[in-house]
Design a protein with these regions (language model features):
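Flavin (FAD/FMN)-binding glycine-rich loop and adjacent Rossmann-like elements that form
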Residues: 5-10, 14-26, 30-268
Length: 271
């Protein structure tokens, strides 16, 4: 960062053109990890520092050539087996995961499959992999996560073809171009969004947008842990402008995953 006292005036960047100096009246940190803010000296927390963890990363992928009719029949036949909370079905295809685990074909610390039909009836999105202990502010950790994420994609895809009706002839169409990061730095701002703000559906006067996503917190108590906390008062909550304004530094704003929020509140607004 290029600083003039407590004001950020630009930065030194490395790009395909080489090392460049870019001056800016205002810089908006959209790095996801709050890289600019952290290097400028703004205080932050990395994940849930009380528990010394971050939410696990994931490697999303998409499959095609699925017989949707057979898959829907499988789900319909087990509709009474779903674990339900607040009217929402959880743990899709967990009966097949249990079968595969018993036969030694499932090594992941997951108990179910996140599977969602795409626009085309035969294309389905899979959100199941879970890579624990990844620090997205560390390049070596990111590399390890990429390798493990793609290994898990291979295992999950093999499982789908072998155990899930309708997926016998499925094809792996694509996977994420990079690791999906749920949590890293939470930059300290003039205001901080809390889980209570979300539950109570608070909309401060300086809200810059409103959200309706409930808190979806992964892996806080181990790789099989999932917490889902819904809004109890109203249908939405606001993100105050103060959450985008970092402490101590002028000329800098935050956007995206890194803005000022507690770890559990970030489980909602990260989406």
């Amino acid at each position: 960062p290029i600083m003039d006292g407590s004001r950020l005036c630009g930065g030194i960047f490395s790009s395909k053109s080489g090392v460049e100096k870019i001056n800016a009246a205002v810089t908006i940190d959209c790095t996801g990890d709050g890289d600019v803010a952290a290097r400028a000296g703004v205080p932050f927390e990395n994940g849930n520092e009380g528990l010394h963890i971050t939410q696990p990363a994931t490697m999303f992928f998409r499959i095609g050539n699925v017989n949707a009719e057979k898959l829907y029949h499988e789900i319909e036949a087990h509709k009474n087996d779903f674990y339900r909370k607040d009217g929402v079905n959880y743990r899709s295809l967990h009966w097949r995961v249990a079968e595969a685990r018993a036969k030694g074909d499932w090594t992941l610390d997951r108990v179910s499959i996140g599977i969602f039909q795409g626009v085309k009836p035969d294309e389905w999105n899979i959100n199941t992999s879970r890579i624990m202990g990844i620090d997205s502010t560390d390049s070596r950790s990111l590399t390890e996560g990429e390798i493990e994420g793609r290994r898990q994609v291979d295992e999950i895809f093999r499982f789908l073809k072998k155990y899930v009706p309708g997926c016998e002839d499925a094809r792996l169409l694509c996977s994420g171009s990079t690791l999906g990061i749920r949590e890293s730095r939470h930059i300290h701002g003039e205001k901080t969004l809390t889980l209570e703000d979300i539950i109570e559906g608070r909309t401060p006067h300086d809200s810059v947008l409103v959200c309706s996503n409930s808190a979806d917190i992964h892996g806080r108590f181990g790789p099989k842990s999932n917490e889902y906390v819904v809004i109890q008062n109203g249908d939405w909550y606001g993100i105050p402008y103060g959450c985008l304004v970092p402490q101590r530094i002028d000329g800098l704003l935050l956007a995206g995953r890194c803005f000022s929020a507690t770890s559990d509140a970030a489980g909602a607004v990260r989406v």
